């Protein structure tokens, strides 16, 4: 528990006090957000707000994780390092995208194919490494079985199938967080909630690990406590950043942050063997992503749009909802999804105790 508290506290403090330094740094260099002309007119006042704040989130989380491991007996593990590596790799892809937008003074950063290629490369490397490094009990950081709240033994993907599955999960989650990052504080707050859920899940898995004591309902998860430290570090980093990212935002996370956070969430789900459960925990991201998919499909098939604008949060903006109202209501949805996911996770464990 000490490591979890240290990770969250260090990441929170670094993010809270480091973000205003980043705001001044980016503002002095003109690293401001470009606003689409075809978006909601209320967003035009945000033009020039410093972006690439995701660098602070990522750095804070990594430092929080590193400092916490100075006080743990085992030190960093393969599972924790792989999740951090995945977040860092995707953060670099997002950083390039943000930097090109700023340098070229345009809304388009990396071309779609180039950006996708970067995500694919990072995700594939992660997927390949995740099924390496067996520990003394033969457990690897990830499993080649599909998992909900634990592995389904009958749903075996094999190594190649797992890498493809990991690629799909990483791509879907990182892009889902990216689509959600359209209003001040929305993606940051929702991400903090899901990371908080993963702290609880992985801590529970550590308390009920089959490696510690074989008992009904125990979890065959490698390094669950270190994963809890990672999740706590990212939750703390998001909370500290949210202080400055809440409306009216003084800085945006940019693709640097959204891709990194999405990657970390996907990595946590894969390593904790809660892959399908992530769709419940991150229900807000799923709803927002589906709104964009439905909008595109509807327009291509019928030449009609279902929503005034996609993703969904912009639909409500154009209906006249205040930005803060949308964010708070969407946070409520995110919180309910997290509560439901935790309930499902705990309920499944209870069934083993009867």
Curated annotation (Swiss-Prot):
The prosthetic group or cofactor this protein requires is:
Mg(2+)
- Pathway connected to this protein: Cell wall biogenesis; peptidoglycan biosynthesis
Segments traversing the membrane: 3-23, 51-71, 80-100, 116-136, 152-172, 186-206, 227-247, 251-271, 276-296, 330-350
RNA-binding among keywords = no
Keyword vocabulary terms for this entry = Cell cycle, Cell division, Cell membrane, Cell shape, Cell wall biogenesis/degradation, Magnesium, Membrane, Metal-binding, Peptidoglycan synthesis, Transferase, Transmembrane, Transmembrane helix
Q: Could you tell me what reaction this enzyme catalyses?
A: UDP-N-acetyl-alpha-D-muramoyl-L-alanyl-gamma-D-glutamyl-meso-2,6-diaminopimeloyl-D-alanyl-D-alanine + di-trans,octa-cis-undecaprenyl phosphate = di-trans,octa-cis-undecaprenyl diphospho-N-acetyl-alpha-D-muramoyl-L-alanyl-D-glutamyl-meso-2,6-diaminopimeloyl-D-alanyl-D-alanine + UMP
**According to its record, how does it sit in the membrane?**
Multi-pass membrane protein
EC top class, as a word: transferase
Any S-S bridges, and between which cysteines? none
Q: Give the record's GO biological process terms.
A: cell division; cell wall organization; peptidoglycan biosynthetic process; regulation of cell shape
Subcellular location as annotated:
Cell membrane
Superkingdom classification of source: Bacteria
What does the entry list under GO cellular component?
plasma membrane
The Gene Ontology terms for molecular function here are: metal ion binding; phospho-N-acetylmuramoyl-pentapeptide-transferase activity; UDP-N-acetylmuramoyl-L-alanyl-D-glutamyl-meso-2,6-diaminopimelyl-D-alanyl-D-alanine:undecaprenyl-phosphate transferase activity
| UniProt EC number | 2.7.8.13
Q: Which PANTHER family match?
A: PHOSPHO-N-ACETYLMURAMOYL-PENTAPEPTIDE-TRANSFERASE (PTHR22926), PHOSPHO-N-ACETYLMURAMOYL-PENTAPEPTIDE-TRANSFERASE HOMOLOG (PTHR22926:SF5)
NCBIfam families referenced in this protein's UniProt entry, alphabetically: mraY
Question: What's its job?
Answer: Catalyzes the initial step of the lipid cycle reactions in the biosynthesis of the cell wall peptidoglycan: transfers peptidoglycan precursor phospho-MurNAc-pentapeptide from UDP-MurNAc-pentapeptide onto the lipid carrier undecaprenyl phosphate, yielding undecaprenyl-pyrophosphoryl-MurNAc-pentapeptide, known as lipid I.
Q: Which family does it belong to?
A: Belongs to the glycosyltransferase 4 family. MraY subfamily.
What is the name attached to this protein's record?
Phospho-N-acetylmuramoyl-pentapeptide-transferase
Q: Which organism is it from?
A: Acidothermus cellulolyticus (strain ATCC 43068 / DSM 8971 / 11B)
| Lineage, uppermost ranks | Bacteria, Bacillati, Actinomycetota, Actinomycetes, Acidothermales
What would be the name of the gene that encodes this protein?
mraY
């Amino acid at each position: 528990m000490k490591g979890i508290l240290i990770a969250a506290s260090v990441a929170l403090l670094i993010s809270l006090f480091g973000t205003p330094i980043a705001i001044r740094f980016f503002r002095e260099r003109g690293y401001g957000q470009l606003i689409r002309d075809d978006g909601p007119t209320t967003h035009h006042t945000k033009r020039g707000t410093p972006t690439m704040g995701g660098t602070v989130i990522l750095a804070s989380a990594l430092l929080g994780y590193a400092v916490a491991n100075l006080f743990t007996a085992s030190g960093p593990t393969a599972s924790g390092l792989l999740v951090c590596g995945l977040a860092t790799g995707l953060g670099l892809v997002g950083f390039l995208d943000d930097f090109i937008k700023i340098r070229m003074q345009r809304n388009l950063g990396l071309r779609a194919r180039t950006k996708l290629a970067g995500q694919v490369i990072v995700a594939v490397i992660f997927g390949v490494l995740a099924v390496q490094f067996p520990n003394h009990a033969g457990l690897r950081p990830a499993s080649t079985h599909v998992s909900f709240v634990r592995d389904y033994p009958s749903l075996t993907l094999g190594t190649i199938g797992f890498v493809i599955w990991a690629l799909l999960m990483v791509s879907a989650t990182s892009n889902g967080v990216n689509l959600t990052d359209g209003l001040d504080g929305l993606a940051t707050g929702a991400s903090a909630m899901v990371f908080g859920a993963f702290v609880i899940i992985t801590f529970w898995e550590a308390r009920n690990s089959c490696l510690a004591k074989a008992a009904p309902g125990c979890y065959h998860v490698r390094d669950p406590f270190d994963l809890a430290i990672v999740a706590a570090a990212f939750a703390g980093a998001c909370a500290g950043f949210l202080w400055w990212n809440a409306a009216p935002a003084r800085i945006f996370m940019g693709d640097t942050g959204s891709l990194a956070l999405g990657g970390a969430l996907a990595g946590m789900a894969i390593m904790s063997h809660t892959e399908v459960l992530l769709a419940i925990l991150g229900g807000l991201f799923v709803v927002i992503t589906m709104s964009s998919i439905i909008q595109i499909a509807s327009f291509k098939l019928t030449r009609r749009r279902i929503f005034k604008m996609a993703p969904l949060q912009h639909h409500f903006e154009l209906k006249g909802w205040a930005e803060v109202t949308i964010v708070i209501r969407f946070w409520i949805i995110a919180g309910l999804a997290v509560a439901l996911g935790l309930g499902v996770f705990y309920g499944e464990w209870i069934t083993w105790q009867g």
